[in-house]
A protein has these predicted regions:
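Metallocofactor- and cofactor-centric catalytic cores in central/energy metabolism, strongly enriched
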Residues: 11-25, 33-42, 61-66, 74-78
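Glycine-rich, highly charged phosphate/nucleotide-binding loops
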Residues: 68-86, 301-312
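Short, charged, surface-exposed secondary-structure boundary motifs
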Residues: 60-69, 131-135, 267-274, 363-366
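Redox- and metal-dependent alpha/beta enzyme cores, enriched for Fe-S-associated oxidoreductases
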Residues: 26, 37, 43-55, 239-303, ...
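A charged, amphipathic alpha-helical module
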Residues: 2-30, 140, 144, 148-273
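Acidic/His-rich segments in extracytoplasmic proteins that coordinate ligands and/or metal ions
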Residues: 79-152
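TerminUS-proximal long segments
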Residues: 307-322, 326-381
Length: 381
């Protein structure tokens, strides 16, 4: 199958998650909504159910969710609730609500109340002190709770061997996505930012084994291509999410390719594998423990600005000329971190721009002007 045909299939999935959900339900699969961030999807998969990512929507308007949410909740969380309320997600058999930020914590309770007569909500509280033994034990207790709730929905026990098998499936998927990110940069004349986003976004709505098989086929086609002749500029993207095709078209129109990303919706979600050698449940706990350089996670060495330096090094090592930060409106962790990230980028001499984004935005005129000007600056350096 050609690159164009494979990408077209991924794009169709990314553009129509509701249709994808219906297809799995029609096939007899139970589906569990998975909100951001770092939920152990492997447990859902091990139960024989389909994990279904919930990252807001670029096409819906917040209406009914306003009854539950303060105005300063980020639109990703509000739109997840909106889709649960307006029937978009009626086919779900349950939803996992992680609580890793100040918006998701109360939102988990809003969803629990709003969905009390509709579907079970599985509360998940990750430990911020995740390195110490007590943090690992807390995480294990939480994952055991999630496992128990999933068993109620599935109607059967989730066995250790099934979790181990799920970990292998997910590790293969993570490896394939990491490879794709590199190949997309190497062949940015073929994989533009819109296509790159669609391929990665589709992973949230597909069976991981099916997704990985298709992605491996795409990677093989990309490897066979000659070296790219790229006359534009390359950047690293950073933020929570940047999947709006209208905004990404601005990158394409200005010959801006994405060399790598530090995006929660993209590479942050598949940086860290789970061990295939240890106890499967502990492997998932240690996977979370080993997750690092994330603005949403506590860093006991934050005074060293490790994350800022990590992002700066990513720009250098990827061959990018600058960084574009997508600042999600009302995202406290990102807003609080920005001065430290700016300090690291300035110290490394890396040009960057910060764009305020929101899933309710429909006019990207200001962002387009900023990106065009930034591309012009980078092109003459």
């Amino acid at each position: 199958m050609s690159i164009e045909a494979i990408v077209k299939e991924f794009s169709a999935v990314a553009a129509n998650p509701k249709g994808q959900l219906k297809a799995y339900k029609d096939a007899g699969k139970k589906c569990i909504g998975v909100m951001p961030y770092y939920a152990p999807e492997e447990l859902v998969y091990a139960a024989g159910m389909m994990p279904f990512g919930m990252w807001g929507s670029n096409s819906k308007t917040i209406q009914r969710a306003k009854e539950y949410c303060a105005t300063f909740y980020c639109t990703i969380a509000q739109l997840d609730l909106e889709m649960l309320l307006d029937g978009t997600m009626d086919l779900l058999d349950g939803v996992i609500t992680p609580t890793i930020c100040d918006t998701l914590r109360p939102m988990s309770q809003n969803i629990r109340v709003a969905m009390s007569e509709k579907l079970p909500c599985i509360f998940l509280a990750h430990p911020q002190n995740r390195f110490a033994d007590f943090g690992k034990q807390f995480c294990m207790d939480q994952y055991d709770h999630v496992k128990g709730e999933l068993e109620k929905i599935a109607g059967h026990e989730i066995k250790s061997e099934d979790i181990a098998a799920a970990i292998k499936v997910y590790n293969k998927s993570r490896a394939a996505r990491r490879e794709f990110v590199k190949l997309a940069s190497d062949h940015c004349d073929v994989i533009d930012p819109i296509m790159r986003s669609a391929v990665l976004k589709a992973a949230w709505f597909m069976d991981k084994a099916e997704y990985t098989e298709k992605l491996n086929a795409l990677n093989a086609e990309l490897k066979a291509l000659p070296a790219a002749k790229w006359n534009g500029v390359k950047v690293v993207t950073s933020g929570i999410i940047c999947d709006n095709p209208v905004l990404l078209k601005v990158f394409k129109d200005n010959n801006v390719a994405i060399a790598a990303d530090d995006v929660a919706h993209e590479s942050r979600a598949f940086r860290t594998d789970a061990s295939e050698e240890s106890d499967p449940m502990m492997a998932l706990v240690e996977q979370f423990t080993n997750t690092d350089y994330d603005v949403l996670l506590y860093d006991p060495q934050s005074s060293k600005n490790r994350r800022g330096e990590f992002v700066a090094n990513m720009v250098k090592e990827s061959g990018a000329q600058g960084l574009v930060l997508f600042m999600q409106q009302f995202c406290d962790p990102e807003e609080m971190e920005f001065p430290y990230l700016k300090k690291a980028l300035d110290a490394a001499g890396i040009p960057f721009i910060k764009l305020g984004v929101d899933q309710q935005m429909r006019d990207f005129g200001q962002a387009a002007t900023a990106i065009q000007a930034f591309a012009d600056v980078l092109s003459v350096q």
